[in-house]
Regions:
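Surface-exposed, glycine/proline- and aromatic-rich loop segments on solvent-exposed faces
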Residues: 96-270
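Secretory pathway export signals and precursors
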Residues: 11, 62-65, 177, 181
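Sequence context of c-type cytochrome heme-c attachment sites
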Residues: 21-63, 77-104, 127
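Gram-negative bacterial Sec-dependent N-terminal signal peptides
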Residues: 1-19
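Histidine-centered active-site/metal-ligand motif
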Residues: 70, 80, 181
Length: 271
C-alpha cells in the first residue's frame, strides 16, 4: 500500500507545535505526531443522529460531543457501516471502514502548516484518477467513482484519487466543536437519503439566487428548518451570518487534481 503525505499551509491558525519558516525546510521529525482513526460514516446525517435510529439521539440534540460515546470505537463503527445496511445502501466491495491518520502541525508568524500521512486503500497509487483513452476513433473517459452506475454494473473500473478534507471553525459555529461535520451533512444532499431532484433545486429561491444546481453541505443556521434543505434563509440573512463568521473553512487536497500543482481548494460551508 502506498503512503501519501500531504502538507497544507493555512493562514492565521494557531497550533501548539514547533515553529517553522518554510514548508520545505520544516524538520517534521521534531514535530509531535497525533494518531487519529478516521471511520466511514456512510449516510449518517444530521437528521439521522437526531432520530430514534441513533441510540444517542437525545444526547446529540442536547449538544453532547460525539466523542463522549464513540471515542475509541471508530474502527468498529466504520467496519460495521461499510458492509451495508440502512446507512450504506450501496456497499463497495473491498472498501475499508476506517483509516489510520498521522497528523502534525507547525506554525510561524504568518502561517500554520498541517501535515497528514496515511496509506491509500486503493489497489493502485492514490494519485490515480479518471483517464481519457483513445480507442482509435475518439477519446473516451476511463474509470469512474465506485458508486457510479457504470462501475456498479461492471462496465467501468472504479478509479478515483485519494482526497484529504478538513473543516476549521474559529468557535463561532454553534456545536461544531462537539459534533463537527455532522452539522453539515443532511438528508436531501447529493448522495444522501431523499436526494434532491433537479426540479426541486430549480424551484428553490436560495439555490437559484446563489446559482447552485445541486445541494451540497450546509450549516443549520442557513435554513429556517435545519433538517429541510428547501427552507433556505434569504441571501441577505446568510450574508449577515457569514459576515459575523458563522461558517467553517473547507480545505480539500486532491492527490491527482491539486497535488500536482502544489495546491488545495480553499472553500467554506454555510449555505
Amino acid at each position: 500500500m502506498t503512503k501519501i503525505a500531504s502538507a497544507l499551509a493555512i493562514s492565521a491558525l494557531a497550533c501548539s507545535s514547533a515553529l517553522a519558516a518554510d514548508p520545505a525546510t520544516i524538520d517534521w521529525s521534531k514535530v509531535p505526531v497525533a494518531n487519529v482513526t478516521l471511520f466511514y460514516p456512510g449516510q449518517a446525517s444530521y437528521e439521522w443522529v437526531r432520530s430514534g435510529s441513533h441510540p444517542g439521539s437525545k444526547m446529540v440534540a442536547d449538544g453532547t460531543a460525539c466523542g463522549t460515546c464513540h471515542q475509541g470505537k471508530e474502527k468498529a463503527m466504520g467496519d460495521k457501516i461499510v458492509k451495508g445496511g440502512s446507512l450504506e445502501p450501496t456497499p463497495v466491495k473491498g472498501k475499508a471502514g476506517s483509516a489510520d491518520l498521522k497528523f502534525q502541525a507547525a506554525y510561524d508568524a504568518k502561517n500554520a502548516y498541517l501535515r497528514f500521512q496515511w496509506k491509500t486503500q486503493l489497489p493502485d497509487p492514490g494519485t490515480e484518477h479518471q483517464y481519457l483513452r483513445f480507442d482509435g476513433k475518439e477519446w473516451k473517459v476511463y474509470g469512474f467513482p465506485k458508486l457510479d452506475k457504470v462501475v456498479q454494473e461492471g462496465k467501468q473500473p472504479g478509479i478515483y484519487e485519494d482526497r484529504m478534507t478538513i473543516m476549521i471553525d474559529d468557535g463561532k459555529v454553534p456545536l461544531f466543536a462537539q459534533q463537527g461535520c455532522w452539522l453539515t451533512c443532511h438528508n436531501g444532499e447529493r448522495d444522501m437519503p431523499k436526494q434532491f431532484t433537479k426540479e426541486e433545486v430549480a424551484a428553490n429561491a436560495l439555490l437559484t439566487a446563489i446559482k447552485k444546481n445541486d445541494v451540497r453541505k450546509y450549516l443549520p443556521a442557513s435554513r429556517n428548518d435545519p433538517s429541510d434543505w428547501k427552507t433556505g434563509k434569504t441571501v441577505e440573512e446568510i450574508a449577515k451570518i457569514k459576515a459575523d463568521g458563522g461558517f467553517v473553512d473547507l480545505i480539500q487536497w486532491r492527490a491527482h487534481r491539486s497535488n500536482g500543482v502544489g495546491m488545495a481548494d480553499d472553500g467554506y460551508v454555510l449555505e
